[in-house]
Amino acid sequence: MPCNTKAPTIRWFYLTIGILSMLFAGILYSWSILKAPLADAFGWNASQLTMNFTLTMCFFCLGGVGGGLLARRLGTRLTIALGGALACIGFVLTARLDGSSLPMLYLSYGVITATGIGFAYNVVLSTVQAWFPDKKGTCSGALLMGFGASSLVLGSLADALIPVSYTHLRAHETGAY
């Protein structure tokens, strides 16, 4: 952490950005909202979809370890950017699923998205905490609050949007568009 007169002020900005970053990273835990529409749309059963969440948690943890190692070599900015890019690619691939390939769901959401979020999670947590040597508990609590609040905030938004996109998907499949 740089020692200068702006440090007391700038650290709160970094904490705010960190909380927002963790809010978006926490969307990983909204899997239960996505599970039912995927089962309905593609005919996948509960055990197949549960396996995806198991993979997601494994690769999220591995991504955290990998993110820590990459941050030492590439720096925190590049590691967070790489994590964000991986998560974005994973979400785009997941959104483009046509139901013909369950392994593609496992790869896109379970591996790519989770690894990217793991990269960002670990690096954001450790980087922002470095700005708060006197308030590590407050800092980590605020960051983890952002991660946990994601299911409430973004999960509720996703829950509201899924019926709209699902109706569009069904209309497109039946030739209504």
Could you say what each language-model-derived stretch is?
Residues M57-V65, L152:
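Residue-level signature of mid-helix packing/kink "hotspots" within the transmembrane helices
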Residues G64-G75:
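Helix-to-loop junctions at the C-terminal end of transmembrane segments
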Residues L86-G99:
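C-terminal ends and interior cores of transmembrane alpha-helices
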Residues M104-G118:
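Hydrophobic core of transmembrane alpha-helices in multi-pass small-molecule transporters
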Residues G137-L154:
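Glycine-rich segments within core transmembrane alpha-helices of 12-TM secondary carriers
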